[in-house]
Each structure stands twice: as structure tokens, then as C-alpha cells.
Amino acid sequence: MSGLSIRQRLALELHRQLIKDAQHNHPLHQLFWESTLRCNMKCRHCGSDCKVSSVHPDMPFEDFRKVLVRIKEKYDSHKIMVIVSGGEPLMRDDLFKCGRAIYDLEFPWGMVSNGRLMSQRNIDRLLASGLHSLTISLDGFEEDHNWMRGTEDGFGYAAGAVEIMAKEPGIKFDVVTCVNNRNYESLEQFKEYLISLGLKKWRLFTVFPVGRAAQDPDLQLSNERFRGLMEFIKKTRKEGRINASYGCEGFLGEYEGEVRDNLYTCQAGLSVASVLIDGSISACGSIRSDYHQGNIYKDDFIDVWENRFQPYRDRSWMKKDLCGDCKWFRYCQGNGMHLRDDDGNLILCHYERLK
């Protein structure tokens, strides 16, 4: 990898101070609610263990509502985005009531959906419930998407929802695509397809090697293809026809400032928190290792947010092994928390992949 430019280094130094401020002040900006583990798909890479939905039934909304009321007592609710996740949130019959209640508490709210139940009627009901943002997963053309999602008809529903939402004013809307070895070669054609649907914002992810995804070679890009993905995003951004960006994870060296709207930082525990299906208080919903900081059924959320989360806000414990003598640790801070196992070991380094 070639070195970073002077412009990039200056930007990273300025950004480093912003990260320090966030570690100290930890302003809550985004709260995920894992509302259900039920799902209507069988995704190859799924991070939520939807097979245990019978063990962990849907969280009663009133339990989560109490958390929101407590947060509203302390912070400005207008500045905190509530993201309803799953599973598939639309599996909840009361989702629209939940959304409206969140809206009535003056929190903006959004959701992440696989699109399977995103009919025009349900979209209208979501909008009437005060929906502020929506993300739909679309992992390539029909054959590739359905393969990834473990369904025979998922593509049509998701693509239809994208076409509807792309025309909806006033909603923050984007599509996320998990790039893998099946859809990699068709990214250029898929980009043109998304543009034809009217999409303005497209996030591309790679699947991190945890759980079943770690053992599936179709899901893990080679280092060469990973760099190719960075070049594709960089080129697409320069074209200016669709706002493409790489997912939030990973310090990307020479690609910092080139493939995302912002420079890398893991906001887990700094500005992002989550309430999981069992009441656990955590940070980013992608974190599957045990870095929970409390539980809403026995702890006060505000007390947990303001006085715990030390492993997230002081990353010095990560400066070991591969990160021990890395000159980029001052900017990377040990990569995302979701890329640490239960013992604190690093699972994946994006910078190493780009060397």
C-alpha cells in the first residue's frame, strides 16, 4: 500500500481529536432496539441467531418504552435516532404502534428490513407511524440475492420496495449490499440497475468472518478482490451518479476519505448504544461477543451509558499482538468492537488486507 497523502494525514489528525472528544463526552446519537429475533429468511451470513427466537420472544414494547422515557428525561430526544432491528422488524404485528409511540416520544426512528414484507400498504403504514429512515438489504440481482437470503422470492419484494422508497420524499433511505464472491463480478451492472430504480444512496459491506460466515468461502473476498471493491467504490463516488460508500468498519489506509463520507472511527459505545432482545445494554448491534455493559431489567440505562462502556472508550487494551506496534493505531484504535472475540483478540484487520 502506498503512503497516505499529507492531506489525508492532516485530516486524520483532526479527526483523532474529534474521537478523543467523543470518548470523553460520549453523546448518545443512535440507539438500536433488537425488537425481535423472528425472521422470514434464512440468510447465509446472519449475525442474529434467529433459530433461538423461541428462547427469546419479542421484547414487550413497554419494556423498551421505559428506556426511551428515561433517556428523554436526560437527553434531547430529537438528537437520538432509534433504529428498530431484528430479525425482521415487520414480523412484529405491533411494529406500527411501536413506531408511532417512539415518534410520539419525539425520537426520530428508522428500521432495517430485508424487504420481504415491505408492501405498499405496509410502507404507507410505516410512514403514517412517523418513519424517518429506512434501510433495505439487496444483495445483487435475483439469483445472487435469493442465494444470499435463503429464499426463492426475496428479490422481487425487496427490489419493489426499493423502487417505491426511492421516490418517497422526506425519508432517509438507502440500500445495503453484502459483497461476496457471487455478486462481485456484477457490481458494475448492479450499480446501473440501482440507479435506474432512482436510488441515491448505496452502502456496500463485506461479511466479517464470524460464525457461519467464517466457514463459507463464497462469502469471504480475497485481498485482491477487497482492494478491487475499494477501487470500485472510489470510482463510483467520482462519477457522482449515486452516493456509494463502504460500510463503517475498518481503517482503510490510503482509501481513508476516498470511499466513505467520513473518516474511520468505531462509534460503538461513543455515540451508539443498543438494547438487545434479552434486555442487554450493548453498543453496535453487530457485536456478537460478550461486551454487554448491563441489562435494562436490572440497571438504569442512563447510569450504564454514562458510567460504564470503558472498554469502548479507552481502547488502550487493544494495543497488543498485530496492533501492538502498528503505526496506524492512533487513528484505527484497534478496529471495530465487533471484530474482537470474547478474549479481546482481533479477528480481522482491514489495513493488512490492503497492503
Regions found by a protein language model. Name each.
Residues 2-133, 221:
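Conserved alpha-helical substructure of the radical SAM core
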Residues 25, 74-76, 128, 170, ...:
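Alpha-helix termination/capping residues and helix-transition junctions
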Residues 27, 37, 266-267, 320:
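Residue-level preference for beta-strand/loop junctions
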Residues 50, 86, 138, 206, ...:
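Residues that line or immediately flank small-molecule/substrate-binding pockets and catalytic motifs
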